[in-house]
């Protein structure tokens, strides 16, 4: 069973109609857990076209997407690794005025919002912004990215997303990379675990992402802020150590990037969560 199949199963959708294969019918698109300009150029174009014809875009990610951030009605950055917490907050917000089973109601009442907000960087203000944009929407599309499927807490993330679509009448799900025949109904799991240890990625972080051009396989691309944090020079040959493995790369400063996460293009997607705390040193010539 692939990661994607497991994730779709954990969404626990009671009705196939809750799945969407296109963004076209949505009046609000909420994208989370993907960098479309890198991971899915077709999706990025489709979202851009929707926004140009009046759809509102909410974009939540660990960094800005050069194509989508400027098109967003609201963009907010969450901390690497905190996706489960972000979904707990979104689910609580979306289901606030919905009649829920007692067990779920209690779960959301007891959710430690202070802790989750502090660790994820998505607080009350961000949730209020999202609520304001969604308040009059008749069709909200929740775009679930590949980061969510490879996350150690993928099952519970899918459970939260699934709860939203099963209980909120105006939300449908778009699973990035899924084909029509991947989308299946399943029994919902409505027993949630407490969120009490959101991981922290302290230090220099790299994001392994697909290559857009073949030449990128040798590069590590980062913003001016990343360059300062990692103490590297533009066009310098460096060794990037991730879990004891050393990758020789050339650092390239990219002024279109923001934040302190560098992009590490790879030729094939791996099934592990794509963020890594890395050690970066200048390579011996």
Regions found by a protein language model. Give the residues of each.
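A structured phosphate/pyrophosphate-recognition subdomain
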Residues: 138-145
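Short, basic, glycine/proline-bearing loop/turn elements
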Residues: 3-6, 29-34, 114-115
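Amphipathic coiled-coil/heptad-repeat helices and related helical stalk/stem segments
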Residues: 15, 43, 126-127
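A conditional alpha-helix N-cap/helix-loop micro-motif detector
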Residues: 12, 40, 123-124
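Long, well-ordered, tryptophan-enriched scaffold segments
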Residues: 51-138
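A short acidic, often aromatic-flanked loop/helix-cap motif at beta-alpha or helix-coil junctions
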Residues: 2-5, 80-87, 180-183, 257
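A cross-kingdom feature strongest in bacterial/archaeal respiratory oxidoreductases
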Residues: 18-31, 35-71, 143, 150-285
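Glycine-rich oxoanion-binding loops at beta->alpha junctions
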Residues: 2-23
């Amino acid at each position: 069973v692939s990661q994607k199949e497991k994730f779709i199963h954990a969404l626990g959708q009671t009705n196939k109609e809750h799945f969407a294969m296109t963004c076209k019918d949505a009046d609000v698109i909420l994208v989370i857990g993907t960098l479309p300009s890198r991971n899915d150029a077709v999706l990025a174009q489709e979202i851009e076209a929707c926004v140009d014809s009046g759809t509102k875009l909410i974009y939540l990610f660990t960094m800005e997407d050069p194509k989508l951030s400027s098109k967003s009605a609201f963009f907010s950055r969450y901390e690497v690794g905190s996706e489960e917490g972000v979904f707990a907050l979104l689910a609580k917000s979306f289901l606030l005025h919905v009649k829920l089973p007692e067990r779920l109601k209690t779960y959301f009442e007891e959710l430690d919002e202070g802790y989750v907000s502090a660790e994820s960087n998505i607080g009350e203000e961000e949730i209020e912004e999202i609520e304001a944009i969604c308040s009059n929407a008749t069709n909200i599309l929740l775009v679930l990215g590949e980061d969510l499927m490879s996350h150690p807490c993928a099952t519970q993330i899918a459970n939260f997303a699934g709860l939203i679509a099963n209980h909120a009448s105006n939300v449908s799900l778009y699973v990035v990379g899924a084909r029509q025949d991947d989308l299946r109904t399943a029994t919902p799991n409505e027993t949630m675990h407490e969120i009490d240890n959101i991981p922290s990625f302290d230090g220099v972080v790299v994001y392994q992402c697909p290559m857009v051009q073949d030449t990128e396989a040798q590069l590590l691309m980062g913003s001016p802020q990343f360059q300062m944090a990692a103490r590297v020079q533009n066009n310098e040959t460096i060794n990037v150590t991730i879990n004891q493995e050393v990758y020789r790369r050339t650092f390239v400063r990219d002024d279109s990037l923001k934040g302190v996460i560098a992009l590490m293009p790879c030729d094939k997607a791996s099934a592990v969560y794509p963020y890594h705390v890395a050690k970066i040193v200048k390579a011996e010539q």
